[in-house]
């Protein structure tokens, strides 16, 4: 299918990968951006097709075109748990509220919870994500229905490779890998849960398995002070040092949280090219603190932006996360220039693409990349007066401005209508699940 997005203000990367806004014609053919032509240079550049030969034309009037947003850390199935463990300390929230509910969940519960999360993602402009979930096959089926792009993992737990639960979950992971090996939109990775749930021997085994099958690692690390203290007491090192010692970082790794980290930890992350997926809202809401993002950026660590799950955030809306990441570090550092709007936008686009290992495929509006794009309505109070679009994205937008979502050249939402999911059915089923599982 040939799609032309005509005369639209477009957020583009320049040669320094700093975002600029230019009016462009954007040409999509099948799943790929064929050309991005600035309107003032239209006569000088040959377009791949015209508005007369396009199969579909989208007007750029009052619209801003962005690369699709990338959520670097999520638990999409948790959306039905929104509000069931608020204002609790991390350990009480996780062990007394979340894990007991998860133990009762069926495959259908996982699928419906995942559908709700995917719906929220589409409506707020997320087109790709890195997720840790329960029951990977029903989760994958929901993602296929929705049409989003994702890397999925099962939280792997246990004392070692002979642990019964570890065997079951690794088997599930490998079955999902086999199913989605040729799938263009879904990739399966290894998900050692955290150092308090996935012990060193199991981490070592997962590292070897990931290396053998060329799989990425998705893991929670150094999320709370207690996690770090317990790890040092048990293993004599920090969670990041433990993961490195176990060999996990020999594989491309996404380390979620990394709130309580030493300079030695940061050196390990940089040396091993580990991406940090920072989740500022979840970290603050659970009382875990603020990750030292400016120090990470100074060390040239790739930092991408995530939401965590709706049980701890309580939203998967990346515009909310963008606002917080840009504001919290200005306040903590007492420096207004700390984490600019453009830096925050980079974290949820190009840095997220790098976290996924897809920096040459997605994350920016460029010819040759996959057509993962979103259009925002700028004829809204949050954009007025329309003088600095990127600042508006960070400081005044709330996600309701997202009008159209395209993934892999397929229109998933247009004029705020999601085409791939049944919203009313999803709402109905999730309210039933919440009532049953939280009695």
Stretch-by-stretch model annotation:
Residues 1-50:
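N-terminal metal-binding scaffold of metallo-dependent hydrolase/deaminase domains
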Residues 10-23, 286-287, 353-390:
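Acidic, glycine-enriched loop/beta-strand segments at the rims
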Residues 80-112, 146-161, 166-167, 225-252, ...:
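Active-site gating loops and adjacent loop-to-helix segments of metal-dependent hydrolytic enzymes
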Residues 82-148, 169-182, 430-439:
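Alpha-helical scaffold segments that flank or form the walls of functional sites
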Residues 138-259:
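Metal-coordinating catalytic core of metallo-dependent amide/deamination hydrolases
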Residues 245-252, 294-380, 396-398:
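His/Asp/Glu-enriched, well-ordered alpha-helical/loop segment
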Residues 370-427:
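C-terminal cap of metal-dependent C-N hydrolases
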